[in-house]
C-alpha cells in the first residue's frame, strides 16, 4: 500500500463499524493484486473513508 491507501485503511480501522474494521484488517494483510481485487469489490467503503 502507498501512504494515501494506508491513511484510508487506518480510517476504516479507527472509525468503521465491525464490517469496515474487518475490511481494514484484510487490506493490511493482502498483497498488491488481492488488495486491488478487494478494493474493486467494495468501492463504496473506499470512497466513504477517503472522504473522511
Language model feature labels by segment:
Residues 1-25:
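N-terminal acidic leader/helix
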Residues 20-51:
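Short, charge-rich amphipathic interface segments used for partner binding and complex assembly
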Amino acid at each position: 500500500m502507498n501512504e494515501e491507501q494506508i491513511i484510508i485503511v487506518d480510517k476504516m480501522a479507527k472509525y468503521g463499524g465491525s464490517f469496515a474494521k474487518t475490511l481494514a484488517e484484510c487490506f493490511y494483510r493482502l498483497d498488491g493484486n488481492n488488495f486491488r481485487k478487494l478494493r474493486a469489490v467494495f468501492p463504496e467503503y473506499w470512497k466513504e473513508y477517503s472522504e473522511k
